[in-house]
């Protein structure tokens, strides 16, 4: 693992420098914190030993659930080109093109970006996520974060949100990171383009933070705010305290 150096700030660790065992330990520790459980006896000493070592494992990107490469390709294209397009994710140009984009994403085939309007690609991605990505964030984490926002528990929010990037599988972490980059691109140019950023978060809140069966009445505004805060989280580095 690789730690960033800043004598005036808590030690930060690059997630991509972790080996498989370290990533699993981090995920377990973050889950324990989210669930309000203490780490097992001896785990702190074990973790601190990990922090002091460099790991040479190269297999940390093994995935538990895959996401088609065509999805990431489309997200990269949207990120690069959405800065001057109004109503991205909100309205399409062609329903037929949207349907074709969804099919291509499902078949893991690349979209011909030169032949399709960006709004149709974005809408295709939105529908693909709605239909195919139902467990981006684990059920137990969704329950806990909805409870925290429903009761406006500030301490619980601060515990859960920054740890979510490290309890999801790597494909979903990369998906959320790509989504964050898209939103940043749209937000930076929202005023000039008259974009309703809040509506985009309102659309994706229920898609990313899926309502558990016993929480179907959760207000969409709660899910929107969770996503807004999650998109401010650091997906690349985490403090060493997350291990404890």
From Swiss-Prot:
This is Uncharacterized protein ECU09_1400. It holds the Pfam family RhoGAP. InterPro entries: Rho_GTPase_activation_prot (IPR008936), RhoGAP_dom (IPR000198). Transmembrane segments: none annotated. GO terms for biological process: signal transduction.
């Amino acid at each position: 693992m690789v730690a960033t150096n800043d004598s005036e700030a808590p030690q930060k660790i690059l997630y991509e420098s972790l080996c498989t065992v370290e990533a699993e330990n981090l995920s377990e520790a973050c889950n324990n914190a989210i669930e309000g459980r203490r780490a097992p006896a001896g785990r702190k000493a074990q973790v601190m030993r990990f922090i002091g070592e460099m790991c040479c494992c190269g297999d940390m990107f093994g995935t538990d659930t895959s996401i088609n490469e065509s999805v990431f390709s489309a997200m990269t294209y949207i990120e690069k080109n959405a800065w001057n397009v109004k109503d991205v994710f909100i309205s399409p140009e062609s329903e037929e093109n949207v349907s074709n984009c969804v099919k291509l994403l499902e078949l893991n085939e690349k979209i011909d970006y030169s032949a399709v309007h960006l709004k149709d690609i974005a809408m295709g991605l939105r529908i693909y996520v709605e239909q195919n990505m139902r467990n981006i964030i684990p059920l137990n984490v969704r329950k806990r974060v909805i409870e925290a926002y429903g009761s406006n528990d500030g301490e619980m929010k601060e515990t859960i949100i920054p740890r979510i990037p490290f309890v999801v599988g790597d494909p979903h972490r990369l998906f959320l990171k790509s989504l964050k980059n898209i939103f940043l691109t749209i937000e930076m140019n929202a005023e000039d383009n008259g974009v309703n950023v809040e509506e985009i978060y309102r659309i994706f809140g229920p898609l990313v933070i899926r309502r558990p069966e016993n929480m179907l009445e959760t207000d969409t505004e709660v899910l929107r705010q969770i996503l807004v805060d999650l998109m401010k989280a650091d997906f690349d580095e985490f403090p060493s305290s997350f291990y404890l």
